[in-house]
Amino acid sequence: MLRSHAAGSLRPADAGQNVTLAGWVARRRDHGGVIFIDLRDASGVSQVVFREGAVLEAAHRLRAEFCVAVEGVVEVRPEGNENPEIPTGGIEVNATSLTVLGESAPLPFQLDDEAGEEARLKYRYLDLRREGPGKALRLRSKVNAAAREVLARHDFVEIETPTMTRSTPEGARDFLVPARLQPGSFYALPQSPQLFKQLLMVAGMERYYQIARCYRDEDFRADRQPEFTQLDMEMSFVDADDVIAVSEEILKALWALIGHDLPTPLPRITYAEAMRRFGTDKPDLRFGLELVECKEFFADTTFRVFQAPYVGAVVMPGGASQPRRTLDGWQEWAKQRGAKGLAYVLVGDDGTLGGPVAKNLTDAERDGLAAHVGANPGDCIFFAAGPPKSSRALLGAARIEIAKRLDMIDPDAWAFTWVVDWPLFEMAEDATAAGDVAVGSGAWTAVHHAFTAPQPQSEATFDTDPAGALADAYDIVCNGNEIGGGSIRIHRRDVQERVFAMMGIEHDEAQEKFGFLLDAFTFGAPPHGGIAFGWDRITALLARMDSIREVIAFPKSGGGADPLTGAPAPITPQQRRESGIDAKPKKDGE
């Protein structure tokens, strides 16, 4: 070893020891004939002092981020010179030898200053030397280890599934890899290990997991990555409660890493209730401000805007004091989300109603509105009217925005809930409008994916009543973030083929794309279910990071670009010819 001790491990009890440290020069300070450096390694920082002779002369050439090895004696710092902000603040190392292991060029940014994201990603190897980013990756390693420990106790088997497979419709576009030995044909990088883990259940593995790399060629969305990581699990001979129980044990172990005792079992809320009360399927439960249904209250209204399939409201406490410019800003805020605007009523200090909507209400409506929605004098009532899904989504977004503006969200709180009783299908046009890919050519598509089992009471009727069919599915939400989703799977060929048919995937197409799975179901497939956790998002939450990029070693920037390596990049004409990208695949029999 080139060092005897870690820089962050030294304490006053080590005084008098000869040590060898190795790391980077975090700071250098010249105090008139004495040079101090903060020497940083993965464990922390120690102060090193160069006082005289050749070692002092050598220290004059040190600059930030030089990689060095230092020999010296641990000394207790003089009284008054201690640094209580760091664990090693009571000692310093009096250097007797200095070796420069690697010089550093002038830095593109100072590591202890803020830097732009593009520069940080281009020089990610420098960015990771900083305490925050480096600490996040080390936490990620602990997260992996904690999950593996729980799963080992439950006899799970860690199995790697292929990362080059065939393209199958799973809800997003595939990344494609040309097959050189079969010109015109392509592998696909997996969007998830879904089909392989189900095949492993058919194979009798019973309990599988994998920390899996997944790939989705999606249009750019904020804080999405084209390649990401899941903790993927599957279990045979289980129901939803069994999968949820193991999942909660994992979550409890993960949050224990940051000193939080997660109480289990976690609460559950149905999808319908989440949409009704919070306007979203991933509700943030750290604060109140629930939506209020107003359709019946305005059943006889003459106000045409409120003669809609859905009318709802959310109250902004103290919002009546907002100036007109701020209220107009809410309209722009709503239009940015595809709405025409955000109707509002102001409740005066004396209880009278004001604003442009109030004059369109009857006396009875004005008299009873505040009580119906739970508004007090000085509050603002925001409304949405129209199709239920989009109107609730607008109010749900307004609820979050209100909470942010009023500082109602406790940043230290953790609020978990399972969302259960999901619809099995949604209209394909609704999925497309929401930015998702509607799998299949039918009018209906799967809300989760095509392999989700219907609940028992919906199994016989989902093809005649798709709107009312419920899925045996469950998502886990933390602080308004979906951090995992799973379901009991279909394990019978006839049920799977009926689901495909509902989605417009007819027999021949299903056999071509999923025949291997359908065939497997004919060989005694066990009931099974599982879940996949968004590992990047979970780690970001634990690290208190706003973006998943902060917990990924080498993330992509917006649009999937990699400033570090310059990927994606053009290929050479020779590579294009050899890969067979432009070749037409041979037809059967040719």
From Swiss-Prot:
GO terms for biological process: aspartyl-tRNA aminoacylation. GO terms for cellular component: cytoplasm. Its EC number is 6.1.1.23. Residues 557-590 are annotated as: Disordered. Keywords: Aminoacyl-tRNA synthetase, ATP-binding, Cytoplasm, Ligase, Nucleotide-binding, Protein biosynthesis. The keyword Oxidoreductase does not apply. Homodimer. HAMAP family: Asp_tRNA_synth_type1. This is Aspartate--tRNA(Asp/Asn) ligase. It comes from Mycobacterium sp. (strain JLS). The gene is aspS.
